[in-house]
């Protein structure tokens, strides 16, 4: 219904890549907190980093359905790999497509799609999480430059970034209408990073604070129009929700796979636990939730590909897929019993990785607000 033969070929390509290149190193990445640069390079070479980016910028020019299929398959092998995949296609690529100049696309977007440049999306602050409009980072005009001061927190990929997309207040009196987007060089004077967070999951893509102290940014590195940064941020996050939702699908599918395999192998009372109705009902509920979530994600991607407004559908997909994935992984761990609590089993990693999906790029509560606001218009 949602996919063409071409989409299915893309899915197979992503699945084969994930099984051959990512699955074998996923547990080691979780232990060492280092994702191999050669795998990142291979993902870029396979066209994954620009799957839905226009061909003129080095992308594949595919659609949102192609993107979610790849996200699903890559995340099935590793949620962390899904982060590396989603960034150029979503949080980091979208702002350039929306408001970037030709020069900015040439300088930042193209190298990012090729896997040669890494960026970070710096919106969240200690006092501005779900209330993104409350950013306190300031940008003061000084001739041909703006001087940035502030602190960003929980920024994915910050310590390994070459450049940072920073949202700062250029007019303190206008609230969300006084926020501007800047492109900042990670290595320039005044930019520093906090200690990488000791995270529960998604280990292998570092997360840290970014400290900006009198950072001098030329006006040519303003991304979009002055005081229009909040609009850019919100549009970017809206587009990105289906990617995160697809990431949830991949992790949930991996959990179902592990639970089915374990239930068939594990014997109690002289027979596989898969023969017990209690386990069968749990597996049935997991599979039903997963397929319901898939339909929501695929429908949102399809509507976006048709050029229809899909804010509500994207939020429904992100909300339901995230919450369902958490429940599915929890049930899969329960099926494993005590072994599910041991790091030698994949389900333990999935349990830690999946939890953040209901938090980042818009919490489940924010998604509910978006859904409700669309209903009550």
Curated annotation (Swiss-Prot):
It comes from the Bacteria. Its cofactor is FAD. The keyword Oxidoreductase applies. GO terms for molecular function: acyl-CoA dehydrogenase activity; flavin adenine dinucleotide binding; oxidoreductase activity, acting on the CH-CH group of donors. Pathway: Amino-acid degradation. Keywords: FAD, Flavoprotein, Oxidoreductase, Phenylalanine catabolism, Tryptophan catabolism, Tyrosine catabolism. InterPro entries: Acyl-CoA_DH_CS, Acyl-CoA_Oxase/DH_mid-dom, Acyl-CoA_Oxase/DH_mid-dom_sf, AcylCo_DH-like_C, AcylCo_DH/oxidase_C, AcylCoA_DH/ox_N, AcylCoA_DH/ox_N_sf, AcylCoA_DH/oxidase_NM_dom_sf. Its EC number is 1.3.8.15. Disruption phenotype: Mutants are deficient in reductive metabolism of phenylalanine, tyrosine and tryptophan, and exhibit growth defects when cultured with amino acids as the sole carbon source. It catalyses: 3-phenylpropanoate + oxidized [electron-transfer flavoprotein] + H(+) = (E)-cinnamate + reduced [electron-transfer flavoprotein]; phloretate + oxidized [electron-transfer flavoprotein] + H(+) = (E)-4-coumarate + reduced [electron-transfer flavoprotein]; indole-3-propanoate + oxidized [electron-transfer flavoprotein] + H(+) = (E)-3-(indol-3-yl)acrylate + reduced [electron-transfer flavoprotein]. FAD binds at residues 121-130, 154-156, 266, 277, 334-338, 363-365. The keyword Hydrolase does not apply. One of its GO terms (biological process) is L-phenylalanine catabolic process. The active site is at residue 361. Belongs to the acyl-CoA dehydrogenase family. Essential for the reductive metabolism of L-phenylalanine, L-tyrosine and L-tryptophan. Catalyzes the reduction of phenylacrylic acid to phenylpropionic acid, 4-hydroxy-phenylacrylic acid to 4-hydroxy-phenylpropionic acid, and indoleacrylic acid to indolepropionic acid. This is 3-(aryl)acrylate reductase. It comes from Clostridium sporogenes (strain ATCC 15579). The gene is acdA.
